[in-house]
Regions:
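Acidic-glycine-rich active-site phosphate/pyrophosphate-binding loop
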Residues: 3-7, 48
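Divalent metal-dependent phosphate-bond-processing catalytic cores, especially two-metal-ion Mg2+/Mn2+ enzymes
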Residues: 1-4, 15-43, 55, 83, ...
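Short glycine/proline-rich turn/loop motifs
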Residues: 10-14
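His-Asp-centered metal-binding catalytic motifs of divalent-metal-dependent phosphohydrolases/nucleases
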Residues: 46-78, 88-98, 127
Length: 178
């Protein structure tokens, strides 16, 4: 499945993350996982999900980075690039971003509406079951990897600690769909 938004998302991700081969490998793995969910959504929503999979880490690109909080920076870019509100909100709120924004004292996510919970759960599932190298991984292993990369005082570490149960609940909800 490759709709117009997904194709545009791929071009943006491959261009803007070109110098970050590890991150791009992860993004490609997330896209592969997201394509599994296409049959559960209408064509437009499925296209938005795959586009968001391509774009969920675009906020790490130097050309996009503004605040240093990749979900917010990415969502602002996605909105300004005309990908639509669903894609922007998925990028904004993916994988526990609301908890991390709170840990960072950022309020910028309030500019975005909450995406449908099932679509957000699907993107979160895909992100949490794809390792940093793009290979499938258990959500527990992925979260352990994130915790190991960030010290206990880092907002990422604190957010994963605080949001772990909800993140794993999203993964469980989506496993039933597969």
């Amino acid at each position: 499945m490759s709709g117009v938004l997904a194709q545009r998302g791929r071009r943006e991700a491959e261009s803007r993350l070109a110098g970050q081969s590890g991150r791009l490998a992860h993004v490609r793995g997330v896209v592969t996982a997201a394509q599994q969910f296409g049959r559960h959504f209408d064509a437009e929503t499925a296209d938005c999900l795959v586009a968001a999979a391509w774009l969920h880490d675009i906020g790490y690109a130097p050309s996009v980075r503004r605040t240093g909080f990749h979900p917010l920076d990415g969502a602002e870019f996605v909105r300004s690039a005309g990908f639509g509100e669903l894609v922007a909100s998925l990028v904004a709120f993916h994988t526990g971003a609301r908890v991390e924004a709170s840990e960072r004292g950022l309020e910028g996510l309030s500019e975005f509406s909450d995406p449908p919970s099932d679509v957000l759960d699907a993107l979160t599932f895909c992100d949490l079951t794809t390792g940093s190298d793009g290979a499938p991984v258990s959500a527990d292993d992925r979260l352990s990897d994130v915790l190991a990369r960030y010290g206990p005082e880092d907002p990422v570490h604190r957010a994963v600690d605080a949001g772990r149960e909800e993140l794993l609940a999203a993964v469980r909800r989506m496993r039933d769909w597969l």
